[in-house]
Each structure stands twice: as C-alpha cells, then as structure tokens.
C-alpha cells in the first residue's frame, strides 16, 4: 500500500470508528477508487462510479437553478443512507450508514475527514 493510500485508509477507518459509519471511500471526481474501508458485500468500483455520477449530477442541478455549490448528497433508504461530500477539487468522500444513525454527527465527522482527504489528494 502506498504511503498516501495508507494515510487515506487511516482517515477512513477513523471516520468509520467514531461516527457509526459502516463503510467509507475516497474517490476521484470521475469515479475511480482512491482508498476505501467498505463492507465485503459492497463492490467498491461500482460504488465509486455511482457516487461520482450522483455527486456530479447534484452539482450540475444546483448550479443550473442558481443555488450556489452543492455541498453534499444524501440518499436514504429503509436499510441505510449513502452520503457524499466534496473533498476538494479532486476527490469525493462517500459514507454508508445504518438508517437510524445520527445524521448530524455523521456529517460533522465527514466534514473533518473530507478536509484531511483534501490535503492528502492535492
């Protein structure tokens, strides 16, 4: 594992451990995996591609309706949540949670992790 990848993996492990996150990933804006700590039943490559597509679509939609910059995307289902947030101009942070998680705490943890990821991915 490269040094940068190991640093990113550690950031993701901390996010998962401290914030009731079941899985997380740092991905490129074009949908490639940089680093991940995901459950075994989640295909990281598919998650990366879909999360990048969703984030890009949300950013375009918000821009088109003149509402500034999209900060995060939240998808909720009965089984859990999928959240994405930008981690600078080059990366996106993705998190998977249970449905009953404290969303505020997860988003705060994601903000801190995204700032760390942005510094590493420059």
Stretches found by the model and what they are:
Residues 1-122:
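Non-catalytic interaction/Regulatory regions outside core domains
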């Amino acid at each position: 594992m490269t040094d940068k990848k190991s640093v990113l993996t550690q950031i993701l492990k901390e996010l998962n451990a401290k914030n009731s996150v079941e899985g997380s990933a740092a991905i490129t804006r074009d949908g490639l995996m940089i680093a991940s700590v995901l459950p075994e039943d989640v295909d990281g490559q598919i998650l990366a591609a879909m999360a990048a597509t969703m984030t890009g679509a949300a950013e375009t939609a918000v821009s088109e309706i003149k509402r500034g910059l999209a900060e995060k995307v939240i998808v909720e289902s009965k089984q859990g949540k999928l959240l994405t947030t930008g981690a600078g101009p080059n990366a996106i942070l993705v998190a998977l949670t249970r449905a009953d998680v404290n969303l505020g705490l997860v988003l705060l943890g994601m903000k801190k992790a995204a700032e760390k990821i942005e510094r590493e991915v420059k």
